[in-house]
A protein has these predicted regions:
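PRPP-dependent phosphoribosyltransferase catalytic core
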Residues: 2-4, 136-184
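Conserved acidic residues
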Residues: 52, 120, 150
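Short glycine-rich phosphate-binding loop at a beta-alpha junction
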Residues: 51-58
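Short Gly/Thr/Asp-enriched flexible loops that form oxyanion-binding sites at enzyme active sites
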Residues: 64-72, 139
Length: 184
């Protein structure tokens, strides 16, 4: 089963995958799709507030944030990592429970990136905002670093996220019943 969606002037067929016996989600994957990544970045930047740094979580939205930084001529962007690495130094840490990840996971912000964020305007970017848990975790890292969240953006807002007034997005994405029909 697939769901056709138009986003940033392009149409893509998104495959559906079950999350539970009664819930399926459409997989929106920009990895390997430079045309979609470039178009979404361009359209998001048209809506973006002024920012000092962009922030996302590993891994699916890295191409999007990279392209946004390139188009905005930003010299640096930040990525919260899913695993602690020695080169992250005295990293900041938070926990996230995402709809697409079984169980909880941690996100880490490097010591160097945390120092960059202090007192700066941080624009949080994700490929899809759904439950808002990943967004909440990124906001927590920004607060820990002493940064200021100036905006929250995504290519798609899934399910009830499309009703939020504190995010900017390009297109809504429904959740689906097990039979592939959009939930209402």
């Amino acid at each position: 089963m697939h769901y056709p969606i138009e986003v940033a002037g392009l149409t893509r067929d998104l495959p559906l995958f079950p999350v539970t016996d009664t819930l399926s989600i459409a997989a929106f994957i920009m990895l390997g799709d430079p045309e979609l990544t470039e178009s979404c970045a361009r359209e998001l930047l048209k809506k973006a507030p002024a920012f000092d740094y962009l922030l996302t979580a590993e891994a699916k939205s890295i191409p999007l944030i990279h392209e946004m930084a390139r188009q905005a001529k930003a010299h640096r962007y930040c990525v919260a990592r899913k695993r602690m690495k020695v080169y992250l130094g005295n990293a900041l840490r938070t926990t996230v429970h995402s709809i697409t990840t079984k169980g909880g996971q941690e996100l880490f912000l490097s010591e160097d990136e945390a120092k960059l964020m202090k007192g700066k305007r941080i624009l949080i970017v994700d490929d899809v905002i759904s439950t808002g848990e990943s967004l909440r975790a990124l906001e927590d890292l920004v607060r820990q670093a002493g940064g200021i969240v100036c905006g929250r953006m995504s290519a798609l807002a899934e399910g009830d996220a499309a009703k939020r007034t504190d995010i900017q997005y390009l297109a809504p994405l429904p959740l689906f019943n097990a039979d592939g029909m959009p939930k209402v």
